[in-house]
Regions:
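Short, acidic Ser/Thr/Gly-rich low-complexity loop/linker segments typical of extracellular
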Residues: 63-80
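Structured interaction patches on ligand/partner-binding surfaces of diverse proteins
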Residues: 98-125, 130
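Short Pro-Gly-centered beta-turn/loop motif in secreted/extracellular proteins
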Residues: 82-90
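Residues that flank catalytic or metal-binding motifs in active/ligand-binding sites
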Residues: 55-57, 77, 109
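Short, ordered, surface-exposed loop/turn motifs in non-cytosolic proteins
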Residues: 32-34, 40-67, 88
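Sec-dependent bacterial lipoprotein signal peptides
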Residues: 1-21
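Bacterial Sec-dependent N-terminal signal peptides
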Residues: 17-42
């Protein structure tokens, strides 16, 4: 191979690596938003007594496939929540729900969400819990 060919291959490889290093993972620092609502069933003695969108519920945001919560917010009085300033990527939103048959009588409820472009507002499916 000629020295110029080796230099060209090296240069192309360097540009490829630099481009990948500049990509942001899912998380903060972008211009997109995830929003959604929390719907709850009120249980009394194991019977559904009431239901509706509910306020003051903790909602967690997980970046990529993190098992831990990277961000947290609470729902408004109408059950709405949002996470702002996010980059493109895959996320999960979750709540903790009561569960009579689960360990510690609670379980996680998760929904997958993907932001595909900048300045996008994505509406997540309702998170449905029992309280």
């Amino acid at each position: 191979m000629k020295p110029n060919s080796l230099a060209l291959i090296f240069f192309i490889g360097l540009i490829t690596l630099a481009g990948q290093a500049c990509r942001k993972p899912a998380g903060e620092g972008g211009t997109s938003t995830i929003r959604g609502k929390v719907y709850a069933f009120n249980l009394r003695n194991g019977v559904k007594a009431d239901s509706g969108y509910v306020g003051d519920i903790r909602v967690f945001l997980h970046f990529d496939d993190h098992p831990w919560a990277d961000e947290e917010t609470r729902t408004s009085y109408s059950g709405d929540y949002q996470f702002k300033w996010l980059t493109k990527g895959k996320y999960k939103v979750s709540i903790i729900s009561e569960c009579d048959t689960c360990p510690m009588e609670q379980t996680g409820v998760f929904e997958n969400v993907e932001i595909k472009k900048k300045n996008e507002t994505v509406t997540a499916p309702d998170l449905i819990g029992y309280y």
